[in-house]
Amino acid sequence: MPSTYVRRFNLKDSLSDKQVGDFWKFLLAEFVPTLQKPAGVNSVKVYSGAGALRADIRLVLDMDHAGIYEGLLRERAISPLLGTFYGALDLATSTQTFIREVTPDLLKALSS
């Protein structure tokens, strides 16, 4: 069933302006395009709230099903990039959410 993964995060306070700029270049030019390639990933988008591109950031993946996420972590092209991605995040304030689309198939499965 269609699922969405949302990683909400702030960047580490210790990052310099240059490091923040480098992170954004990496995120948009390398990480997001690599996440979009595997089968089952329908879209990858990045949203920013009121945090001046340092806080209240969301990485949103729309996938065919939630199991796609586990495969992404093992994907040969993605796993070397995870250290750079997670290394810039303030993991103490980071959250992740999985939501699923309510479809007739889901209702059928839940009512069985």
Question: Over which residues does each language-model region extend?
Answer:
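Short coil/turn motifs at secondary-structure junctions
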Residues: 12-14, 51, 64-68
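Periplasmic-binding protein-like
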Residues: 54-56, 105
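Short, low-order "capping/linker" segments at domain edges
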Residues: 99-112
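A short beta-turn/loop motif at secondary-structure boundaries
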Residues: 47-54, 88-89
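Amphipathic, soluble alpha/beta structural segments
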Residues: 56-60, 110-112
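Active-site-flanking beta-strand signature of metal-NTP-handling nucleotidyl enzymes
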Residues: 2-11
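An amphipathic, aromatic/His-enriched active-site/gating alpha helix that lines ligand/cofactor pockets
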Residues: 26-43, 60-100
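Short, surface-exposed ligand-recognition loops at beta-strand->loop->(often short) alpha-helix junctions
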Residues: 11-26
